[in-house]
C-alpha cells in the first residue's frame, strides 16, 4: 500500500513557525496618522530585543514605494526614518491612504496606515444675520470643499494654500453672500459673514408629475421625469417674510416663458413636456413692485415614454383600420349603385327600342291614312265636277273629318 506523505510534510512546515511564534514576542508598528507634502515619514514599534525588522510601505495603488530593514535595540524598540514626501503629489506619491507592513525574522507581522494629504489651512466661518444672530444650516463652499453651519452658525473648512471665493447659501429668508479670501497652510483663519434678509423670496414648494413627487426644492435640485406628461410646480413668494399674492412668477423652460397662476396660496405653473429624450434647466423667478427674487434653477431630465409611443401607434393603427373599413363599405355601396344604374340604362335602352318600333308602326299607319285621304279627295273632286251641289261637298267634308278622327284615335292608341 502506498501513502501520500505530501500533506504531512506541508503540515509540519506550517506547524514549525507557529511553535516558534508561541514563544516569541509580538511586534507593534506606529506612525503619525497624517503627513503633508515636505514631511518625513517615521516608523517605530516594539518587538523582541536585537531582532531584525523588515519594513515596507505601499502607496494607495498598492505599489511598494519604500522597503528597508532595521534592528531593534536591547529593550526591543525600533525606529526608522523612511522617506520625505515631495512638495507636490506625484504618480509615485499620490494623495491618499498608505499602508505600512512590518515583520520579524521570527515570523511576526503587523501593519498600520496613514494619510498623505495636502497641507491645509483651517478656515473657521461664522455666519450671522444683521442682528448678529447665528444662522444654522447655511452651506459654506470654497471650490469643491463644503461644510454646513451648526447651531452656533459655525463651519470649518480645510483648504490648501490659495485664493478662494467663500460662498454662503443660507436658508430662507436670507440671501446668499460671498467673500474672497486668501489662506496659507497650515495657518488658522476666522471669517465672519453677515447675510441679509431676502426682501422678496421665492420658494418652490413642490414639483409633481406621474413619476415625480418632490418637496421644498432648492436651486440645483434635479428632476427626472418621463416624456409626454405634465410637470406641475407650486411656489410661494414672500416679501419681508410675509406671503404675497400679487407677484409675477415665471418659469423659463426650453426657450419658452411660462406664467404662474395664483391659486389657494400658491403660484402654480403647469408645463407639458414632449415625449423626447433631452436635458435642460428650468429657471424660476418672481418679481414684485420692481423687485426681483432669488432665482431657482432646477436641472430637468426627460426620458422617452416608450409605452406612450406604443399606445399612440396602436391608436393610429386602429383609426386607419376603421377608415379602411369605412372606405370598403363606401366602395361596396358605389359598386351596388353602378350595378343599379347599369340595369336602369339597359331597361331604358329596351324601352327606346320599343318606342322606335311604335313610331315606325305609327308612321306606316299615317302613310296608309294619307293614301286613303288622297283617294277620297280624288273622288270628292270627281263628284264636285259632276254635280257641284252643296250636299255633296258637305258629305265629303264630313267624311274627311271622320277620317281625321280615326287617324287621331289610332295614333293615341299606338302611343299609349
Curated annotation (Swiss-Prot):
Coiled coil: 310-330
UniProt keyword terms in alphabetical order: Cell membrane, Cell wall, Coiled coil, Membrane, S-layer, Secreted, Signal, Transmembrane, Transmembrane helix
InterPro entries: Carb-bd-like_fold, SlaB_anchor
Record's bilayer topology term: Single-pass membrane protein
Pfam annotation, one family: CarboxypepD_reg
Cell inner membrane found in the keyword field: no
S-S bonds: none
Membrane-crossing residue ranges in chain numbering: 392-412
Top-rank taxon: Archaea
Chief place where the protein resides: secreted
Gene3D superfamilies assigned to the protein according to its UniProt record, in alphabetical order: 1.20.5.340, 2.60.40.1930, Carboxypeptidase-like, regulatory domain
GO MF entries: carbohydrate binding
Keyword Ligase among record annotations: no
Family: Belongs to the Sulfolobales SlaB family.
Subunit structure of this chain's protein: The mushroom-shaped unit cells of the Sulfolobales' S-layers may consist of three SlaB subunits and six SlaA subunits.
Function description: S-layer small protein. May anchor the complex to the cell membrane.
NCBIfam families with a match to the protein in the record: S-lay_SlaB_Mtsph
The protein's name in its UniProt record: S-layer protein B
UniProt source species: Metallosphaera sedula (strain ATCC 51363 / DSM 5348 / JCM 9185 / NBRC 15509 / TH2)
Amino acid at each position: 500500500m502506498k501513502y501520500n506523505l505530501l500533506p504531512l510534510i506541508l503540515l509540519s512546515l506550517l506547524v514549525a513557525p507557529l511553535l516558534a511564534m508561541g514563544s516569541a514576542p509580538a511586534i507593534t508598528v506606529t506612525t503619525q496618522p497624517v503627513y503633508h507634502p515636505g514631511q518625513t515619514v517615521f516608523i517605530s514599534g516594539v518587538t523582541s530585543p536585537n531582532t531584525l525588522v523588515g519594513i515596507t510601505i505601499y502607496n494607495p495603488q498598492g505599489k511598494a514605494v519604500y522597503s528597508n530593514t532595521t534592528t531593534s535595540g536591547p529593550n526591543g524598540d525600533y525606529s526608522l526614518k523612511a522617506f520625505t514626501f515631495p512638495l507636490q503629489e506625484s504618480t509615485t506619491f499620490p494623495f491618499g491612504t498608505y499602508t505600512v507592513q512590518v515583520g520579524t525574522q521570527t515570523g511576526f507581522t503587523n501593519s498600520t496606515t496613514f494619510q498623505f494629504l495636502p497641507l491645509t489651512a483651517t478656515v473657521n466661518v461664522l455666519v450671522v444675520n444683521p442682528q448678529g444672530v447665528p444662522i444654522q444650516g447655511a452651506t459654506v463652499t470654497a471650490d469643491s470643499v463644503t461644510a454646513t453651519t451648526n447651531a452656533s452658525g459655525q463651519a470649518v473648512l480645510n483648504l490648501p494654500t490659495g485664493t478662494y471665493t467663500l460662498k454662503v447659501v443660507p436658508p430662507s429668508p436670507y440671501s446668499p453672500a460671498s467673500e474672497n479670501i486668501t489662506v496659507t497652510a497650515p495657518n488658522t483663519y476666522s471669517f465672519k459673514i453677515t447675510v441679509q434678509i431676502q426682501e422678496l423670496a421665492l420658494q418652490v414648494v413642490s414639483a409633481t408629475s406621474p413619476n415625480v413627487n418632490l418637496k421644498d426644492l432648492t436651486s440645483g435640485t434635479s428632476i427626472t421625469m418621463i416624456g409626454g406628461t405634465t410637470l406641475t410646480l407650486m411656489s410661494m413668494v414672500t416679501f419681508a417674510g410675509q406671503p404675497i399674492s400679487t407677484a409675477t412668477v415665471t418659469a423659463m423652460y426650453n426657450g419658452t416663458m411660462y406664467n404662474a397662476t395664483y391659486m389657494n396660496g400658491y403660484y402654480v405653473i403647469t408645463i407639458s413636456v414632449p415625449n423626447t429624450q433631452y436635458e435642460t434647466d428650468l429657471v424660476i423667478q418672481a418679481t414684485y413692485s420692481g423687485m426681483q427674487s432669488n432665482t431657482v434653477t432646477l436641472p430637468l431630465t426627460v426620458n422617452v415614454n416608450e409605452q406612450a409611443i406604443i399606445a399612440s401607434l396602436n391608436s393610429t393603427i386602429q383609426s386607419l383600420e376603421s377608415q379602411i373599413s369605412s372606405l370598403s363599405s363606401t366602395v361596396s355601396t358605389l359598386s351596388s349603385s353602378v350595378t343599379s344604374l347599369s340595369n336602369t340604362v339597359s331597361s331604358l335602352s329596351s324601352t327606346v327600342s320599343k318606342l322606335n318600333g311604335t313610331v315606325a308602326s305609327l308612321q306606316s299607319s299615317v302613310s296608309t291614312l294619307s293614301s286613303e285621304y288622297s283617294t277620297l279627295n280624288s273622288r270628292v273632286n270627281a263628284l264636285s265636277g259632276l254635280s257641284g251641289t252643296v250636299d255633296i261637298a258637305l258629305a265629303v267634308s264630313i267624311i274627311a273629318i271622320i277620317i281625321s278622327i280615326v287617324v287621331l284615335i289610332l295614333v293615341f292608341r299606338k302611343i299609349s
